[in-house]
Amino acid sequence: MKPDRDALDEYFEYDAEEFLVSLALLITEGRTPECSVKGRAESFHCPPAQSRFPGTARHECSDKLAQCRQARRTRSEVTLLWKNNLPIMVEVMLLPDCCYSDEGPSTEGADLNDPAIKQDALLLERWILEPVPRQNGDRFIEEKALLLAVRSFVFFSQLSAWLSVSHGAIPRNILYRISAADVDLQWSFSQTPTEHVFPVPNVSHNVALKVSVQSLPRQAHYPVLTCSIHTNIGLYEKRIQEQELRACQHHGPGEVEYRCPSSSQSLCSKHTWTMAPVSALHVRSGMPPEYTAAIRNVRLCPGTGSKSDQGAPQASVLGFSGTGGEVRSQEASVRTFKSLPVVDSSVSSCQSSRQPVGEPNPLMDSLIQDRQEVIARIAQHLIHCDPSSSRMSELPFNTQESTSLSPKLHPVSQESGCVRRYKEAFSVSFGSPEFGSPGDSREGKVREKSETRPGETCTSHSLYPRQPAGEANPLIGSLLQERQDVIARIAQHLEHIDPAAHIPRPAFSKHDSNSIPSKVFRSSFDDKTLLKKGRENVSVSVSHTEVSLLGDRGDGESLKPSKCLRSFKYSPQEKPLKPEVRTQHQNHPDSITPTARQELLNKAAGLLTSSNTALCKESSLGLVSRLESTSCKLQLKEQEMSHETEKQCLHCNSIDKQICTNTCTEKINDEHSPGSLRHLQCDDSKGIDSKLKVTLLEMPDSLNKNKTNCSSKDSKRSKTCEQSIRVGTENDLSEENEGPGSTVSDRLKTEQEAKRDSGAGKPHSVKHCLSAGERLHSADMLRTTLKHSSVWRKHNFHSLDGTSTRAFHPQTGLPLLSSPVPQRKTQSGCFDLDASLLHLRSLSSKSSRPCLNIDEDPDVHEKPFLSSSAPPITSLSLLGNFEESVLNYRLDPLGIVDGFTAEVGASGTFCPTHLTLPVEVSFYSVSDDNAPSPYMGVITLESLGKRGYRVPPSGTIQVTLFNPNKTVVKMFVVVYDLRGMPANHQTFLRQRTFSVPVKQEMKRSINKENVQHTAQLLRYLIHLRFQSSKSGKIYLHRDVRLLFSRKSMEVDSGAAYELKSYTESPTNPQFSPRC
């Protein structure tokens, strides 16, 4: 039978705003990319798909987390639009990987209003959340059903499929835009979208929610998005390639060197003037900011590309004479722009030849895409993570500086006919014959020497310039120093802030492992390993700007000599770049073979001067000395740690009342501590156990000579512990109050006995001492008599109401905390009342009944004996004092039992989700004769939120209690009806379950009423708290408290019984206002 819709009109499982925010967060954060097999995950802010498992903590937002800040903004935007009765639009878009970082533009800034983003973005989905009038009729769904439907759509969306296939790698630049659903604000789809409309649920008294989504049709392949800037760069690059190709066909190799750059210089100058704004260039250029600053200065130069505008600063800075160096520097600047969108620095030598125009190469496209992703990541982190690097743009930077550095980062791959031309260009741009490769032709070397002035030292643009004293340019020195600092910051940011930069990618070629992230941006290992490698490869220190040359040139042998010969140039500016140098040693340990290294050393011997050799020796000696000092420091630290742990162990072995568990594991040192293998493990017994367990590990054969001494020492310690701690309960407690003075005499006596035992040479003295202590302790326990519970109040067992608990059983001496279920003497199975508790002031009765006089009343011997301060006879079955005291935490528990769980559910006009929650179970001591202790369980509902667990206004609540073995202890079923409960009120229900004998023989009619009450034995109890919200919704809040017996359904043998349940609630008043 379908429930009446009108009866459900006032009750909704979610608030309208809360439900709307849950939908928006599910759309925006339900497929957060992550590096896993699934590729995506729901964030902590999304509504849970299932009930929370036991132990799962509720997420607490923090302002330090960007995702939490974004979720807060989403919540505020959705709430604002909903309060203004405006439809909400959520758009899901993709941005190109080349120009946008992993984080992408945020919705809080003005980036979304940029027309470039609107032009570059690919719209995937458009969600419309629109309030509509309340739906009437039989066809309706609940809010939870709509939430499940939206979750299913998000799970099977196109974006989720891409993330799943790529394991979270692509797409990374996902943009969500939340705004009002206005036609003027909507962005257009690239194709005709498909629309899906979800069923409409009612979310409030007069409003329903209509959710629809328009999505792009399924794509066969992942779209390759390109931005407008890189599209323009590609156009210029294509025209430059065509002109150079024609020049190479019509002119000889010698003429190409001079005519190709000059013919394309005007195009390059035009390109620099027509680039994007400075901010876009800084993000999208794909180069670190020091190189970006150089290009930015090129763009801002007033010159139009003529040789006279650029030649003067080149000649003044580099010291070149003639036009050869000038023309080659212009050629290098052209190559910089040309190599940006085309060539990847990770392309191997066999793939570095140019593809014919018009023939697409998918491998090259994938490599270009990978290169652009790395470039975008570098630029983004330099903007958002290192704002200080942006100041580089304000400094003057010469154009030739960029032309000499750019070929290092972005080497150009040309066809085999132009290889010699590029080798000569590299050697000339470096400005020193030392940088030439062994494969250079003789003509190139003669040209280099003729262009360099004799007796004049040319300034190099590598990272280690060498200038004579007095000729150094302070401007260039400061720029080089800042560039080195920026590169060091790049490596730190990409390692510590952007772990996604190290996602493993499929190898495209055998040299793909030499890509930019693996070559430059890797963090160093520990200093010890680095110093060892630095000592072995002192002569092979690679500068960070030359790493990208690996795998890009066709002649592999020409790379290694140039790489090594450059490393011998030393300057004081080398010091801040040691982390990068070490990093490259680690990432490329096989880049220089021993044979190649020997050849390079032989080659270097003829080229280096004596000063360079002395500097290299000094650097190698410095590395060796640092390695030796580091190793000495490590040894000293290890020795200090071993001595400290040994002192801690000896301190723990000493006899005092603060006995702790020794977890120190000593490092064995054969010379200093041969006997450090002994461990003494003591269990914490300060209020838990009255006996001390001493565990001795066997001694190894190599330490037999110390066996007797160690055993005697251990016997002293163990016997002292046993004599001073394992005594009667009263003595133990009084000993704590009196102080350590009483233990000194015992310690002296036990030491004398231990000396006699050790002098006899018995290796089993420890066991003998332990056994003697146990016999003495058992004899003392047998002589101990039962004490009244009020005696325990003398020994520092403080409680909230004065009723104290015992830590040790008075007869057996066993600790009650280590035995959660004490043994009992009676087999009745009921909660026997401890008569001694009735004498305590906290449990005294306030009844006006007169006290019983034994002498005057002749029938008193036939009635159950009662104390003069006992409560009324109607509460003898623990329905009064014990029940209220335990439920209100007025009794201290003896112990806690872990592992209990409970499944909470409800049914009525709707069925909320069943929850499985942990139960905190504790037990108590109710008598001196070891009667069975009842258990109290508390189910905390605070993890569900401030309101609690939503239940129907009337129906049943079912609570199933499971023990640690996952078997059912009790199933509580409580029927309730709170339809008359007003808003913002609270009440409670308490259900008691008694075991009642079926047949009773009343021997004495005078005690008939009394016997009926005493025969009803309380077996189970459940206490439920209810409250109503402002809208009239009913919640089970705060906690659920249970009382249950230790043994399930165990009563007197042979007695027939039945269980009867009674549910009670307040009557006057039935409901009270919420606090």
Swiss-Prot record:
Signal peptide per UniProt: none
Gene: Atosa
Ranges for region Required for macropage invasion: 878-935
Main function: Transcription regulator that syncronizes transcriptional and translational programs to promote macrophage invasion of tissues.
Biased composition (Polar residues): 703-712
UniProt KW Isomerase keyword: no
Record-linked InterPro entries: Atos-like_C, Atos-like_cons_dom, ATOS_Transcription_Regulators
Biased composition range(s): Basic and acidic residues: 440-454, 746-759
Region (Transactivation domain 1 (TAD1)): 24-32
Keyword vocabulary terms for this entry: Nucleus
Similarity remark: Belongs to the ATOS family.
Region feature (Disordered): 430-469, 570-592, 703-766
SMART domains assigned: DUF4210
Protein name according to UniProt: Atos homolog protein A
GO cellular component: nucleus
Region (Transactivation domain 2 (TAD2)): 962-970
Predominant location category: nucleus
Domain notes: The protein contains 2 transactivation domains (TAD). Each of these domains may be required for transcriptional activation of a subset of target genes.
Location(s), subcellular: Nucleus
Protein's UniProt keywords contain Nucleus: yes
